[in-house]
């Protein structure tokens, strides 16, 4: 038995099952504590659990960071896409031929890497922090063998130096976030610091049983997300005809547009169900923009989407509250990058048309250029201050639509789009984009069964937010007398 604070044994591991605990070891103190940490293993036999530890689940995937980019660019440069597509008689064949060329290139010049699921990613510190950590560890090992006042003092100095190095590293990173000006990264960092919840905890199923099996957790969340869907009651919604007289029924896919969309890809994001990395597409944009423009044009003309484009890997994101309740998680869909590229071109065209023709309510502040939570708050604050200045009271009601993104009925959404002037081939392609979708939930690398998506717009897609705006757009029609309202996506404020 080893001491855990000075020469005293204060920290104990107690169990009524001696065979449950293994490899008890006294290690270095945690953070700023003056107690040594105690590490041990809990052994669970196959009778107590129905799954293997996810930390031992290893899969292989392409490591695009180690790809031979010179060979890849040379390979893609020599592809005769006119010949590749020449004998295709359907959109499905065009898709298959394109993916065959891309996948062959990836297999030839992109090495595989082993990926362990269920393990938290290692933190990557700069060299000066790693040096301080290693020095602290070495002194700790020496101190365990020769406990002298001199070594104890040196170890304490090393601990302080290590903490200072970590704090300096964090400070430099936060300074770089501020100077970079990327608001998305800044708010994601802040949100992660305050929430502290990244993974899926143990979940309670429908009969009240708590489980930590990742496969079972994926199934529980999948069933919950399915329960959020809304089935069409077949009632016709009252839609108003668009007032401008303009229509949007076509989108042109040019090589220049496709290359521009490829150039905007974030290379550190994951690929979707088709396995094609955004990094690969962006690095090969000069050679892929022309064939993709041809392919997108054919898909648009025939209202076609490849099978993989209708699939989504759903990552459950914890919101707040009790982490064991499935209702406190929201689904974020990971879809194919190529589909997102086509969506982005369509989205730009649709959004420009809607804004130019005042088809989106001016009270909506989400997903529109030069609109944000700031403009939403400024508008409301201005109205409230004016009322108070005129010695009037202000009553405010906050409305949150439950499961708003998941409850969008596709048929009614298409009716509202058509009433705003979106029609023809464009409306037909959007209908194909929404229908026949499937999703599976992924938890710690384990997947649920695939399930049909009968309503909603995919959260995580490019077109999804704009489609949702059009679905909720008429909530601002026919306002109650002397009642104003303001929207940010599905968050509604009513005030008078």
Q: Predicted segment positions?
A:
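Conserved pre-catalytic core of RNA-dependent polymerases
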Residues: 218, 225, 248-458, 496
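A shared catalytic/ligand-binding motif for oxyanion handling
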Residues: 1-166, 209, 260, 339, ...
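Short, glycine/acidic-rich hinge or "gate" loops at secondary-structure transitions
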Residues: 116, 151, 172-181, 358-368
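Hydrophobic "anchor" residues on beta-strands that sit immediately upstream
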Residues: 396, 486-487
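Short Gly/Ser/Thr- and Asp/Glu-enriched loop/turn motifs at secondary-structure junctions
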Residues: 9, 309-312, 487-491
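Alpha-helical recognition domains of nuclear gene-regulatory proteins
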Residues: 75, 101, 105, 132, ...
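Conserved helix-loop-beta segment at the catalytic/binding core of cyclic-nucleotide signaling proteins
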Residues: 479-486
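Surface-exposed loop/turn segments and immediately adjacent short secondary-structure elements
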Residues: 37, 41, 45-47, 69-81, ...
């Amino acid at each position: 038995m080893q001491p855990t604070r000075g020469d005293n044994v204060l920290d104990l591991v107690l169990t009524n099952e001696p065979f449950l605990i293994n490899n008890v070891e006294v290690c270095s103190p945690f953070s700023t504590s003056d107690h040594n940490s105690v590490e041990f293993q809990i052994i669970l036999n196959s009778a107590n659990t129905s799954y293997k530890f996810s930390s031992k689940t290893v899969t292989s995937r392409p490591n695009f960071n180690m790809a031979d980019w010179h060979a890849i660019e040379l390979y893609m440069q020599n592809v005769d896409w006119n010949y590749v597509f020449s004998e295709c008689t359907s959109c499905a064949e065009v898709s298959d031929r394109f993916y065959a060329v891309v996948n062959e290139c990836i297999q030839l010049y992109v090495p595989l890497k082993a990926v362990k699921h269920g393990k938290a990613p290692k933190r990557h510190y700069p060299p000066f922090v790693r040096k301080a950590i290693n020095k602290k560890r070495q002194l700790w090992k020496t101190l365990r063998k020769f406990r002298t006042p001199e070594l104890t003092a040196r170890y304490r100095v090393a601990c302080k130096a290590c903490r200072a190095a970590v704090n300096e590293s964090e400070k430099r990173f936060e300074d770089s976030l501020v100077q970079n000006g990327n608001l998305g990264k800044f708010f994601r960092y802040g949100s992660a610091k305050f929430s502290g919840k990244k993974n899926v905890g143990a979940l309670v199923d429908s009969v009240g049983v708590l489980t930590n099996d990742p496969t079972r957790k994926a199934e529980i969340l999948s069933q919950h997300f399915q329960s959020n869907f809304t089935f069409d009651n077949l009632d016709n919604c009252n839609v108003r005809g668009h007032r401008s007289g303009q229509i949007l029924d076509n989108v042109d896919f040019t090589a220049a547009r496709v290359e521009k969309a490829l150039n905007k890809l974030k290379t550190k994001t994951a690929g979707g169900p088709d396995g094609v990395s955004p990094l690969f597409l962006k690095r090969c944009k000069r050679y892929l923009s022309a064939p993709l423009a041809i392919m997108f044009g054919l898909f648009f003309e025939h209202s076609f989407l490849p099978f993989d484009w209708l699939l989504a890997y759903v990552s459950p994101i914890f919101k707040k509250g009790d982490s064991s309740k499935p209702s406190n998680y929201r689904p974020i869909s990971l879809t194919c990058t190529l589909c997102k590229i086509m969506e982005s071109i369509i989205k730009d065209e649709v959004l420009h048309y809607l804004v130019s023709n005042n088809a989106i309510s001016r009270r909506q502040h989400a997903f529109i250029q030069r609109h944000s939570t700031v403009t939403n708050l400024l508008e409301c604050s201005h109205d409230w201050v004016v009322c108070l200045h005129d010695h009037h009271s202000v009553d405010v009601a906050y409305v949150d639509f439950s499961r708003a993104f998941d409850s969008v009925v596709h048929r009614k959404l298409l009716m509202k789009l058509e009433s705003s002037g979106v029609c023809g081939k464009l409306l037909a392609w959007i209908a194909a984009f929404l229908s026949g979708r499937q999703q599976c939930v992924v938890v710690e690398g384990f997947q649920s069964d695939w399930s049909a998506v009968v309503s909603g717009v995919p959260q995580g897609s490019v077109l999804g937010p704009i489609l949702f705006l059009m679905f909720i757009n008429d909530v601002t029609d026919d306002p109650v007398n002397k009642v104003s309202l303001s929207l940010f996506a599905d968050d509604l404020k009513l005030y008078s």
